[in-house]
Amino acid sequence: AVVHAETSTGVCNPVEKIGRLVKDNSALYLVDCVTSLGGMAVNMDDWQIDALYSGTQKCLSCPPGLAPVSFSDKAVEKLTNRKTKVPNWYLDLSMITQYWSGKARVYHHTAPINMLYGLYQACYNIFEEGLESVIERHLTLHQKLVNELNGIGLELFVEKNARLPMLNAVEIPEGANDGDVRSRLLNEFHIE
């Protein structure tokens, strides 16, 4: 398992390279795309990802509350051929796969319909702009911010080749109080 876009550090992990290492292994490759989905390229099939999950509250620009997931055929096969009972009924993904398979459905949970409408609209907005355009917008705005930060003497915490385009970790200069910096950003500029 690996986190694609690490929010605590601003690092983009090399998910594609890790996928090439894992592909000839019987292990399943799980990737957390909570921060990256909708903000940068995520190529599940090309990167050999078996299970991917995200959240709606980050780059999908949707209220929190849903966790979009996707599984490779290999992962679904593992789920359906499981020999041991899942100890928690609510977390039994084999029941959820029945929603996708066309088999007789087993009631598993009450879907949050209002959240699904919100996710539908968020995805519509992304596709209306174009996913490539959305990704390019994140890159363009990231570079503008980096240029301005560098122009006033600030540096980013992460090396250029491992930076996230949608989350910028900035080094606080020597002698500056990080609490004061964050308070001023929030109170004067509405930046968290």
What residues fall within each predicted segment?
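Conserved active-site segment immediately N-terminal to the catalytic lysine
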Residues: D45-Q57
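A generic structural signal for well-ordered alpha-helical segments
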Residues: V22, M44, L149, L185-L186
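Conserved C-terminal alpha-helix-loop-beta "cap" of PLP-dependent enzymes
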Residues: N150, L154-E192
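Active-site C-terminal subdomain of aminotransferase-like
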Residues: Q57-N147, G151
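Short, well-ordered, mixed-charge alpha-helical segments that flank or form enzyme active sites
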Residues: T7-C12, L37-A41, D46, L60-P63, ...
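Active-site phosphate-binding strand-loop segment of PLP-dependent enzymes
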Residues: A1-S36, A51
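Fold-independent oxyanion-binding glycine-rich loops
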Residues: V2-E6, V31-V34, M40, G55-Q57, ...
